[in-house]
Amino acid sequence: MVEWFKALVLKTSEVQASVGSNPTLSATILPRLSRRVFYYGSAMLYFEYGEKELNYLKKKDKRLAAVIEKAGVIQRELYPDIFVSLVNSIAGQQISRHAKASVWRRFMELLGGAVTPQAIDAVTEEQLRGCGLSGRKAVYIKRLAQKVLNGEIDFGAFAAMADEEVIAELIKLDGIGKWTAEMQLIFSLGRKNILSFGDAAIQNGLKRLYGHKKITLALAEKYHKRYSPYASVASFYLWALANGDVEYERPRRNAEKI
């Protein structure tokens, strides 16, 4: 397992025991750290990249270079437990961020803070629905846990597999589409060459950066080729553009022709 996947697993109670007696730490560190532990079960890690990847992208694309210069290094958190990340993705489908947080909190309480295949297998679909999950989502999550327990899928094997092979395995699972699979590649496996055409924010970022009215699959593939082998890193800056997190004034001319 690559170094940045190693996580210090801390249960919320252990965090509280460590810093709860210190008023300053309790007021500042505990709310953030315990929230992250509560949701994901480990201390946070970040997608690993630096000057090498950024310099490559800046040389390849002057417009993207301008965004990188303004934004600086963008830190994105990693969630190396693929099982937990997939369950979280299924739970959050087609609901608001606020609703997802509420559902996930109750879900974690039901499982005693440990999102594992064994813990999910030990509860009923009715109990899962009681957390606010739809019947369909409850079924999908139970099936995912059972597949892991039965040895039908081995997330540990993904590290040695190509991106497309991982996607092919993930989309076989109920409730997991290509976009979710691509997000697992970036945010669980730390893969550096993913540009998700199915991501609306990526398309909006490309439109804003290059002046296109529409992003076709062929156009997205051309940009992917330009950014390769660091398309995931480029994606961070496209997301920032789409979300308005970085100011960028596109040159006043027609859309870029590539």
Regions found by a protein language model. Give the residues of each.
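Intrinsically disordered, low-complexity, charged terminal extensions of DNA damage-control enzymes
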Residues: 29-82, 243-258
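Catalytic DNA-binding helix-loop module of base-excision-repair DNA glycosylases/AP lyases
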Residues: 162-207
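Short helix-capping/linker segments at secondary-structure and domain boundaries
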Residues: 94-102, 149-153, 189-194, 241-249
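Alpha-helical scaffold segments that form or flank carboxylate-/histidine-based iron centers
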Residues: 79-94
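A basic, often C-terminal nucleic-acid-binding module that engages the phosphate backbone, implemented
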Residues: 209-258
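Short, positively charged low-complexity motifs
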Residues: 1-3, 15-21, 32
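Ala/Thr-enriched low-complexity intrinsically disordered regions
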Residues: 7, 12, 17, 24-28, ...
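Alpha-helical ds-nucleic-acid-binding substructure associated with the helix-hairpin-helix region
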Residues: 63, 67, 95-96, 100-174, ...
